[in-house]
A protein has these predicted regions:
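Structural signature of tandem-repeat unit edges
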Residues: 40-41, 54-76, 85-98, 108-121, ...
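Boundary at the C-terminal end of the N-terminal hydrophobic targeting segment
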Residues: 23-27, 32-34
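Generic recognition of long tandem-repeat/solenoid scaffolds
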Residues: 38-50
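Bacterial N-terminal signal peptides
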Residues: 10-20
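Consensus positions within tandem repeat domains that build extended binding/scaffold surfaces
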Residues: 78-81, 100-106, 123-128, 146-152, ...
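Positively charged n-region of N-terminal signal peptides that target proteins for export
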Residues: 1-8
Length: 335
């Protein structure tokens, strides 16, 4: 609990510095829910100044609300609207198109959530540490899963990413320990740094054909990950991408990959075999460091450089074939 509160404080300070914390004032209140007027006919749900901790556990947001004789359409859930509230369930109407930054951050009791297909944007940190949320259906109109949207949603076991999504932001699913499998559709072109880092329950991952860029440490310490399918499109196995994936036994690297980057498979202690395609030209420092179960390796002629300590600590390695194209070998490659 102390760790959680400390983390909340750090996040709050970060949001203040980035200008994410809204004014505590609101234009009006109806049935215990506060609103800010956006235009002559639309409003957003907003923070009430002390969070909704003592007001509601089950919330149904109306499509329209009337104030001073004017009727407004509820079109968005504003930044930090339900931050650190004791909500257990919330129903969002079809009139809403956007969910703001940190809108439901630290709602640790939230178990049920309905997001309508009308929603096209979900802001950064929107559901961070909603630790009781078990499943979520992302609407088909959402194009970006922003940074840290679902970080520390430790009970999240079910997730479907729709074909509308083109990017997954940094740490989007960081430490979602209950997540067991993930399939990234072909529509996604980029996966941010640490996107699935620390998802210790994740056993399988499929990365779609559209992905060309995967950030650093995207799957670091996914300790239960046994299989990963990387389809053609990815050009680099990035820095520490699978570091500490201690259950990973084999990986098929696609022909689109040209570089196996620094510490890409560091401490993948169950990795017994890997096939390096002819597209790869460089294997960087510590790429397979401490892969203690790796028994053989064949480096194709396409590879021109092997970094220092690339296979250091591979204590079971009994067969090594180095291709004719290698012109540069670093220090202690097989130490």
């Amino acid at each position: 609990m102390k760790h959680s509160r400390f983390y909340q404080t750090v996040v709050a300070i970060a949001m203040m510095l980035m200008g994410w914390l809204p004014s505590l004032a609101h234009d009006f209140e109806v049935d215990g829910i506060c609103y800010n007027i956006l235009s002559d006919n639309s409003v957003e749900v907003t923070y009430n100044g002390s969070s909704y901790n003592n007001d509601y556990e089950d919330v149904i947001i109306p499509e329209t609300v009337t104030h001073d004789g004017s009727t407004y359409s509820v079109t968005s859930i504003g930044e930090r609207a339900f931050y650190d509230s004791k909500l257990t369930s919330i129903k969002i109407p079809n009139s809403v198109t956007g969910i703001g930054n940190s809108a439901f951050a630290f709602c640790t009791s939230l178990t049920s959530l309905e997001i309508p297909n009308s929603v096209t944007s979900i802001g950064s940190y929107a559901f961070i540490e909603c630790s009781s949320l078990a499943s979520i259906e992302i609407p088909n109109g959402v194009t970006d899963i922003d940074e840290r949207v679902f970080s520390f949603c430790t009970s999240l076991t079910s997730l479907e990413i729709p074909n509308s999504v083109t990017s997954i932001g940094s740490s989007a699913f960081y430490h979602c320990q209950g997540l067991t499998s993930i399939e990234i559709p072909d529509s996604v072109t980029s996966i941010g740094d640490y996107a699935f880092s620390g998802c210790s329950g994740l056993t399988s991952a499929v990365i779609g054909n559209g992905v060309t860029n995967i950030g650093e440490r995207a799957f670091v310490y996914c300790s239960s990950l046994t299989s990963v399918e990387i389809r053609n499109g990815v050009t680099s196995i990035g820095v520490r991408m699978f570091e500490g994936c201690t259950s990973l036994t084999s990986v098929e690297i696609p022909n689109s990959v040209t570089c196996i980057d620094v510490e890409a498979f560091n401490m993948c202690t169950s990795l017994t075999s890997i096939e390096i395609p002819n597209s790869v030209t460089s294997i960087e420092n510590h790429a397979f460091f401490n892969c203690t179960s790796l028994t053989n390796i064949e480096i194709p002629d396409s590879v021109t450089s092997i970094g220092s300590f690339a296979f250091d600590g591979c204590t079971s390695l009994s067969s090594v074939v180095i291709g004719n194209g290698v012109t540069s070998i670093g220090h202690y490659v097989f130490f």
